[in-house]
UniProtKB/Swiss-Prot annotation:
The keyword Zinc does not apply. The gene is kin-2b. ADP binds at residues 110, 112-114. InterPro entries: Kinesin-like_fam (IPR027640), Kinesin_motor_CS (IPR019821), Kinesin_motor_dom (IPR001752), Kinesin_motor_dom_sf (IPR036961), P-loop_NTPase (IPR027417). This is Kinesin-2b. It is found in: Cell projection, Cilium, Flagellum; Cytoplasm, Cytoskeleton, Flagellum axoneme; Cytoplasm, Cytoskeleton, Flagellum basal body. Belongs to the TRAFAC class myosin-kinesin ATPase superfamily. Kinesin family. Kinesin II subfamily. Disulfide bonds: none annotated. Keywords: ATP-binding, Cell projection, Cilium, Cilium biogenesis/degradation, Coiled coil, Cytoplasm, Cytoskeleton, Flagellum, Magnesium, Metal-binding, Microtubule, Motor protein, Nucleotide-binding, Transport. Involved in anterograde intraflagellar transport (IFT). Involved in flagellar assembly. Residues 12-344 form the Kinesin motor domain. ATP binds at residues 107-114.
Length: 642
């Protein structure tokens, strides 16, 4: 279990809303704008469009409207950088301090979620900008060490796929320490933005996308890019490790078949997407209601977001909506969900010294390897005892220099002595051979054989010394390579400290300072507006009784309008719930028919006694969604079956 800093204060899910510009299809349909935003007051006003064919009887009544208030709102002319600096950066900074953080995009298909989260190469979205911020921070934290690991997973038709390895049918597991996690999901150490960009590009190429009437590149799956950031800091001589987990989630959009024109596989995908989003909506509702049972396990998406919704995480919901009147129902539904979500209370805490942190283990492993290498180098002493050659033997970056021979000082002296003796023996043998050619009696055959035997022994001794030195060389190279491989997993700040990057980082910091000033100006402006509203209220209190009566009458009319709006909203909610119930009833009826059909087939072809035997050894595995059968040595009831 990781230690938490303090008890962890309550922190509501933050919600920001972004509206995209009109697209060509909406312009061709003659759609009107129904979204009005006040960036200062953080309000979204949704205007109900006047229905076509409405006569003069309704012309006196203004279209109804609904006002929502969120943590931040962004009109269609807002930029990616503006959205990131003002809303998303706070989540990233929390992760850098050791909190879990989640940023997820929510909205109907074609509303701009993927554009906001991913963006384009020349206009990066929240995910690339998040990593830019992470490595800016790492470059500035001079005395801290960092280990950053990334993974990319897709939920397609309720199947988990690793987008970086292609592995499918991954399983969800739950652990008292880790919480909910994906078994066998690959984690990739990353050292800079370019490395992460490659992973994102590789993962996006594997994502399921398809064209619909609403979106030419509609995401047919949910994707989660997860980053684990381990940070080691020395405080008062003690090493402190904090681990932040960042989930960047791009949800597939909710769909209506009559608008998307989905058929075949697209329709099946849409059904799975809508089911998981309905479960997400149900989880949000239950959390707001304070229900004891939260149906996280009803879908893989909600199980993975379990900590993000009501748990140990700072969470930002990025709501994407369309401005067009043709999407009024979907926009209203999206804004309602978002309005509920902002009431969810999380309990984020700093994750200190978790047991599964890898940075200390990796650092200790590197230290151990360096000690082993130093021992080998000290023993070998570069073959000469020279400090200069010893330093040249290993460059500290996994490369062994030419100065490292692999011999110890004693071995080198011994080999040199053996080589001198061998040289003398060879010369003596040549001399003996020449003497025997001139006179066979000058040198006996025994003397020559003894000399040849001595030469062989010397050669074997030299070869044995060379073999040991070679083994020592190979061992040193292997250890040096392991050191470099493990060091490469840690973020190398030298790579992040190039001149161009430092300039860009300085610009981003200046930009952030301007954002802080802008936020302060917006806060003061909001206070002035509220003060003006209070002044007007005081003026109302000082009016004459007649004016007060008129004011009361106006308020009464306003309350009547609000009551009408609430009734209409209630009617819409009931209609939406009725549609959802109808979908669930249809699905349930189909499942019942399928079960009855299977039962009928079984009853026709499998005798009842065999059915009972099969049922007695069968058990259902909820986690793996599969039947398991107990093996028994004998089953009398099954005798002769098949």
């Amino acid at each position: 279990m990781s230690k938490s800093k303090g008890k962890g204060s309550s922190d509501n899910v933050m919600v920001m809303v972004r509206v995209r510009p009109f697209n060509k299809r909406e312009e061709q349909e003659g759609a009107t704008e129904i979204i009005e935003m006040d960036k200062t007051l953080c309000t979204v006003t949704l205007h109900k469009p006047v229905e076509k064919g409405a006569g003069s009887a309704t012309s006196e009544c203004l279209p109804s409207k609904k006002v929502f208030t969120y943590d931040a709102v962004y009109p269609s002319n807002s930029t990616q950088v503006e959205v990131f600096d003002e809303s998303v950066r706070e989540m990233i900074d929390g992760c850098l301090e050791g909190y879990n953080a989640t940023v997820f995009a929510y909205g109907q298909t074609g509303s701009g979620k993927t554009h906001t989260m991913m963006g384009q190469k020349d206009n990066p979205g929240m995910i690339p900008l998040a990593f830019q911020r992470i490595f800016d921070f790492i470059a500035q934290a001079k005395d801290d060490q960092f280990l950053v690991r990334a993974s990319f997973v897709e939920i397609y038709n309720e199947d988990l796929k690793d987008l970086l390895t292609g592995a499918t049918h991954l399983q969800l597991k739950e652990d008292p320490v880790k919480g909910v996690f994906i078994k066998d999901l690959s984690e990739h150490p990353v050292s800079d933005e370019r490395h992460i960009d490659k992973l994102i590009q590789k993962g996006n190429e594997s994502r399921a996308v398809a064209a619909t009437l609403m979106n030419a590149t509609s995401s047919r799956s949910h994707s989660i890019f997860q980053v684990v950031l381990e940070r080691m800091t020395v405080i008062d001589g003690r090493e402190c490790i904090r681990v932040g987990k960042l989930n960047l989630v791009d949800l597939a959009g909710s769909e209506r078949q009559e608008k998307t024109g989905a058929t075949g596989d697209r329709l099946k995908e849409a059904a799975k997407i809508n089911l998981s989003l309905t479960t997400l909506g149900c989880v949000i509702s239950k959390l707001v209601e304070g229900s004891k049972h939260i149906p996280y396990r009803d879908s893989k998406l909600t199980r993975l977001l379990q900590d993000s919704l009501g748990g140990n995480s700072k969470t930002l919901m990025v709501v994407a909506v369309s401005p067009a009147s043709t999407n009024y129902d979907e926009t209203m539904s999206t804004l309602r969900y978002a309005d509920r979500a902002k009431q969810i209370k999380n309990k984020p805490r700093i994750n200190e010294d978790p047991k599964d942190a890898q940075i200390r283990e990796m650092r200790n492993y590197v230290t151990k390897l360096e000690a082993q290498l130093a021992e080998i180098m000290q023993q070998a002493n570069a073959g000469s005892g020279s400090e200069v050659e010893d330093k040249e033997a290993y460059d500290g970056e996994g490369n062994m220099g030419a100065g490292f021979t692999g011999y110890t000082a004693d071995e080198m002296a011994n080999v040199q002595s053996l080589r001198k003796n061998l040289d003398k023996t060879k010369k003596k043998r040549v001399k003996y051979v020449e003497q025997r050619k001139e006179n066979e009696e000058a040198v006996s055959a025994e003397e020559l054989a003894t000399l040849e035997e001595e030469q062989k022994k010397l050669e074997e001794q030299i070869k044995e010394s060379e073999r040991k030195a070679k083994e020592r060389q190979l061992m040193a190279k292997k250890i040096a390579a392991l050191i470099e491989a493990n060091k490469s997993k840690m973020v190398d700040k030298k790579v992040l400290e190039n001149e161009e990057r430092l300039k860009d980082a300085a610009i981003r910091e200046a930009r952030n300072a301007l954002v802080a000033q802008k936020k302060e100006a917006e806060r003061l402006k909001k206070e002035l507006i509220e003060a003006e509203q209070q002044r007007k209220q005081l003026e109302e209190q000082c009016t004459t009784a007649l004016d007060q009566a008129q004011q009361l009458e106006l308020r009464l009319n306003e309350y009547k309008e609000q009551l009408a709006e609430r009734r209409e909203e209630l009617h819409n909610v009931e209609a939406d719930q009725a549609k959802e119930r109808e979908i669930i009833r249809n699905d349930y009826a189909d499942q019942i028919k399928l079960c009855e059909l299977r039962q009928f087939i079984v009853s026709m072809f499998v005798p009842e006694e065999y059915q009972r035997s099969i049922e007695s050894i069968a058990s259902w595995d909820e986690d793996n969604q599969a039947w398991h059968f107990r093996t028994q040595k004998s089953h009398r009831g099954m005798a002769g079956f098949g």
